[in-house]
Amino acid sequence: MHAVFFDLFETLITEFENNQRKATYSIKDLGIDEKLYKKEWAARRGRRMDGSFPDHQSVLRDIVKTCGKPINESVIESIHQERIKAKSVPFKNQDSEIMNMLQTLKDQKIKIGLISNCTAEEVEGWKESIFADLFDDVVFSYKIKRAKPHSEIYLTACDHLKVSPKNSIFVGDGGSNELQGAVAVGMKAYQATWFQPSFISEEIFGFPKLQKPMQVVDLVK
């Protein structure tokens, strides 16, 4: 194998601790019922991930407008900054096994890439994180206007590292049908379960499950 590509959330970092989010933020100042907000937020997921919305603030404006509320730019900016803070928390205090695994791959001259479905504010913490220097390339969905499981995001990642899909491995928790997407372009796909409770990891079938990060190293031997 020439390269290993990783998912980000719930694969390299986790947003949860003791079954609760490590950090949260409030949207109450928008004046929208929380259940309604969550429904509208979820309805825009695809367009958030593929960059159709240029930024987080534009999503908030669209939701506020749809709900018939007045747009308050200072409130929107305040919520935006709080979301950035919350989303930066998981990039701190990384799992030592994951860091050892990545460093071992690096020492073995295996190329390391990231393929993440994300929006800009969700990965503000990446550039200052310990991961930044270990990865040869990162592909964020919002930047290339394609999200997993679309074939283009995997092929773009392979092209950046000058490797073929058949000589590449993809490791992810399985969200967004990312494992199916990786296999469809010729990659070997493995499910990372180390951050997942069993009732979630067992919902995904057909892919080898990795319980510990260092198992990734064995795949490239």
Please report, for each region that a protein language model flagged, where it lies by residue:
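N-terminal helical cap/lid subdomain that shapes the substrate entry/recognition surface
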Residues: 1-100, 107
